[in-house]
Each structure stands twice: as C-alpha cells, then as structure tokens.
Swiss-Prot record:
Entries under Pfam families matching the protein: Ribosomal_L16 (PF00252)
One term under GO cellular component: cytosolic large ribosomal subunit
InterPro entries, per database record: Ribosomal_uL16, Ribosomal_uL16_bact-type, Ribosomal_uL16_CS, Ribosomal_uL16_dom, Ribosomal_uL16_sf
GO molecular function: rRNA binding; structural constituent of ribosome; tRNA binding
Organism: Ruegeria sp. (strain TM1040) (Silicibacter sp.)
Entry's family note: Belongs to the universal ribosomal protein uL16 family.
Protein name: Large ribosomal subunit protein uL16
NCBIfam families: rplP_bact
Keywords: Ribonucleoprotein, Ribosomal protein, RNA-binding, rRNA-binding, tRNA-binding
Length: 137
C-alpha cells in the first residue's frame, strides 16, 4: 500500500477539506479519468482496492495512473482507553481529496471497458465521482 517514505512530522491535525482542487483537475496522462465531486478523505487501502478492481476488469491491458497519494497520517487510540494521555499512534494513511480532483486515469482500452473499470473503482471509494473523457476538454 502507498505511504510516504519519510515525513517532517509524525502526526497531523485532522483539519477540514474546504474549497475546490487547485491543481490536478484535468486529464494529463490517459483518455478516461475518474473525477471527485465531493470532498472526502480517501485511505491507502481504498486506493489499492480501486486499483485492483480496475486492473482486474481491464484484464491487465492498457495503463492505469493513480493521481492521488496518501500523505496524511490518521491516528487512533486503542479500544477501551480513557480520553487524554496524548494523541494516539498512526493507524493508517489517507489523502484529502477536494472536488474537481482527477484521482485515476486510464488509457489503452476501448471506451466500454474503461467506463466499466472506472465505475467499479468508484464503488470502492467514499467519494462521489464522475467519469471524464479527454474529448470533453
């Protein structure tokens, strides 16, 4: 699964996801893409599950680009532990996705296979998405 090799700080504030995506809102690599419509935190496991669903449907043809990276550590405290006594340890890594962000791109397969692969990937993600095509730009 994806996670940074090293970080400047071990833990991070939760924060909020405000506004629209500044960059990464256009297709750069593939012909078809999956664009986020709502703000959400996508975990490394969800990214991997979406990638596996796409590559399995495409039968290892074509090419998949993952345009997001989980760089935010999410902490949790153990079960049945009282409040206080410091922040919990890092549980998993996540990526804060803003509306308008292209998360996945596909190329090298026909349109029917690409749309179905992206639909299957969207089922694995907590974000509402829409499929975009390069000809739309």
């Amino acid at each position: 699964m994806l996670q940074p090799k090293r970080t400047k700080f071990r833990k991070m504030h939760k924060g909020r996801i405000k506004g629209l995506a500044k960059g990464g809102s256009d297709l750069n690599f593939g012909t078809y893409g999956l664009k986020a419509v709502t703000p959400e935190r996508v975990t490394a496991r969800q990214i991997e599950a979406a990638r596996r669903a796409m590559t399995r449907h495409m039968k290892r043809q074509g090419r998949v680009w993952i345009r997001i990276f989980p760089d935010t550590p999410v902490t949790s405290k153990p079960v049945e532990v009282r409040m206080g006594k410091g922040k919990g340890s890092v549980d998993f890594w996540a990526c804060k996705v803003k509306p308008g962000r292209v998360m996945f791109e596909i190329d090298g397969v026909n349109e029917d296979i690409a749309r179905e692969a992206l639909r299957l990937a969207a089922m694995k993600l907590p974000v509402q998405t829409r499929i975009v095509v390069r000809e739309d730009w």
